Amino acid sequence: MTDSPVLALAKELISRQSVTPADAGCQDLMIERLKALGFEIESMVFEDTTNFWARRGTQSPLFVFAGHTDVVPAGPLSQWHTPPFEPTVIDGFLHGRGAADMKGSLACMIVAVERFIAEHPDHQGSIGFLITSDEEGPFINGTVRVVETLMARNELIDMCIVGEPSSTLAVGDVVKNGRRGSITGDLKVKGTQGHVAYPHLANNPVHKALPALAELAATQWDEGNAYFPPTSFQIPNLQAGTGASNVIPGEFDVQFNFRFSTELTDEEIKRRVHSVLDAHGLDYDVKWTLSGQPFLTDTGELLAAVVAAVEEVNHQAPALLTTGGTSDGRFIAQMGAQVVELGPVNATIHKVNECVRIADLEKLTDMYQKTLNHLLG
């Protein structure tokens, strides 16, 4: 039996071993299809990262599909039922690295746009694609750089669907209409090294820091709101000492992370953390890394169109959530764009034997096409 257009393209993309930041020719496949539809293509290569910006039309509004061609490493090959870069269909599921995150979505986007343009060759507004090979990596030379380039020439995105795997049990059951912000602090508490038998001749930074860390962990940073849970504080990494049992460490390194709502700013978080550390009399340095600001699309044409499209396909409205980690949507939201995430079920992403239900790819294609119908048809 011949594969459907979306399944065939998904297989082609999965077969390319595009472990971040490699693209391995995935974008060339997409560009070839988009050129045939009349898209203007602009390649944007920054160091080891391959990106492209594609646009069809010059009018407003500018609607964009955003996504990434890179994937995480396959992990232990012995644990895969089938080779991760040899797309395989088993019992109605397409298996392979990137099937759900997010080569399946990319295939759905392309086929949806092909079908939409076939029906609406003179559609309203403009359609764009923003594709990167640096979403699973350090996100330095990917979407953020493309956004900077577009903003510098005042080419602003109005509405954007990011194809991240937003769904939980069935495709379209969840639409992410925002994401929490993320900021990490790398704290170094300074003390004086010494022998454990002579603590009066040393200054143990671990002992000094623990009460402050306990206070930070116990703090209620905010109460959240209708769209976001309360801000969370977590400590993922601690390091002190030489490994010897008789040496008091001279330094204590602590890494902590905040996932924060729109009730807080990153500057307010910094101020409150420094206030606690200062109150405990610590000698310290903190290096801050802001991964992304929170964003929210709570109203607007895009959200209404996506919800309507999902409801038309599933006969049930999606839940609107802001849970989970960060995504490239945070960079696009900086343009003032309406941003939502809609993609496959995320149960197997970043795992061995990653897979996506083939029927879900067909449904997702319909959802994308119906969204275009509502907005630009």
From Swiss-Prot:
Question: What broad class of enzyme is this?
Answer: hydrolase
Top-rank taxon, per record: Bacteria
Q: What is its EC number?
A: 3.5.1.18
Instruction: Note how many cofactor molecules are bound and how.
Output: Binds 2 Zn(2+) ion per subunit.
Give the reactions, separated by semicolons, that this protein catalyses: N-succinyl-(2S,6S)-2,6-diaminopimelate + H2O = (2S,6S)-2,6-diaminopimelate + succinate
What quaternary structure, including any partners, is listed in this protein's UniProt entry?
A: Homodimer.
Residues that, per the record, bind Zn(2+) 2: D101, E136, H350
Keywords (A to Z) from UniProt: Amino-acid biosynthesis, Cobalt, Diaminopimelate biosynthesis, Hydrolase, Lysine biosynthesis, Metal-binding, Zinc
Q: What gene name does this entry carry? A: dapE
Gene Ontology molecular functions: cobalt ion binding; succinyl-diaminopimelate desuccinylase activity; zinc ion binding
Q: Which family does it belong to?
A: Belongs to the peptidase M20A family. DapE subfamily.
List positions binding Zn(2+) 1: H68, D101, E164
| Key word Nucleus present | no
Q: In which pathway does it act?
A: Amino-acid biosynthesis; L-lysine biosynthesis via DAP pathway; LL-2,6-diaminopimelate from (S)-tetrahydrodipicolinate (succinylase route): step 3/3
Protein name, per record = Succinyl-diaminopimelate desuccinylase
So what does this one do? Catalyzes the hydrolysis of N-succinyl-L,L-diaminopimelic acid (SDAP), forming succinate and LL-2,6-diaminopimelate (DAP), an intermediate involved in the bacterial biosynthesis of lysine and meso-diaminopimelic acid, an essential component of bacterial cell walls.
Organism name = Vibrio cholerae serotype O1 (strain ATCC 39315 / El Tor Inaba N16961)
One family name in Pfam for this protein? Peptidase_M20
Give the active-site positions: D70, E135 (proton acceptor)
User: Which Gene Ontology terms describe the biological processes this protein takes part in?
Assistant: diaminopimelate biosynthetic process; lysine biosynthetic process via diaminopimelate
